[in-house]
Amino acid sequence: MYGQTVAVRQVDLEVVDPLYCCLLGPSGCGKTSLLRMIAGHEEISSGAVLIDGHDVSVLAPAARPTSMMFQNYALFPHLTVLDNVAFALKIKGLGKAERHDQAFTMLQNVQLRDLAGGYPNQLSGGQQQRVALARALITQPKILLLDEPLSALDPFLRIEMRAELKELQRRLGITFIHVTHSQDEAMALADLVLVMNDGVVEQTGSPMEIFNKPRNAFVANFIGGHNVITIGPKIYAVREDRIRITPMGDSQIGAIEFMGANVRIKVSDGAGGSLTISQTDREFAKLKLALGDQVGVSWQKKDQLELTA
């Protein structure tokens, strides 16, 4: 809680095997607060945090088998890359030779061994992130906590780094819990996704489960790729790629977005409603659609997924 504001409510998360877990949601939904509670940087007002069956709720962050990689990396500018990575081992009292040996090994894991003698201001953003990642992993935590680690990177590097994170998690065999507001990031990285909103977990599942069977209108809208449609008293989700366009009809094309292999088309029905339709570039080329065209839209009943409110 922050004053009278409840940051996270009734969260029940169980991670059984080492996997990549993403906490996904809009700004202010409670995902970073939940991450900080696991790390011990925020107190919990009720419930417990258990790791390997042991309650760590009362333990200080340094006493928990977790390590946290912060959004701003928080590297020490006056220390070399090697000493940044080895810093936690120095605090634990390890000798210089031993901690440097372990730090070299960790830098090898993140492909930065050749830059061990450099300083943070000599590194690119992606290299700084790798240093922060190596520093977080040097203590051999059971759980690595990542607070929006890719948000400061350009789109190309972000895609490259998320592949490296996933491969590293598999190789190390530990659980990564990763906070993000990017749907694409969560879908690409996660074995398990928690979709959060206003301090509550709206849905938990694999990326495929979340996308194919969103539980409610919030999840369908936030994950994207769906139209949320009201038919009588019920609410349905229909995937954008399940809607078909035919020439001539009561709807009008209001926007066309070319996205490489796919094209997104927004159509309005003249009564204030709109639908977004996704087609392959080949489908779009065959129909020869243009802004302002009158078209018909349809979908099969089996492609309607009923939602809770």
Predicted feature locations:
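The feature captures the beta-strand-to-loop junction immediately N-terminal to the Walker
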Residues: 24-26
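ABC ATPase nucleotide-binding domain helices that frame the ATP-binding cleft
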Residues: 32-35, 131
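Helix-to-loop junction immediately C-terminal to a conserved catalytic motif
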Residues: 39
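Conserved ABC transporter NBD signature motif
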Residues: 47-55
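ABC ATPase nucleotide-binding domains
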Residues: 61-215
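Non-catalytic connector elements of ABC transporters
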Residues: 235-309
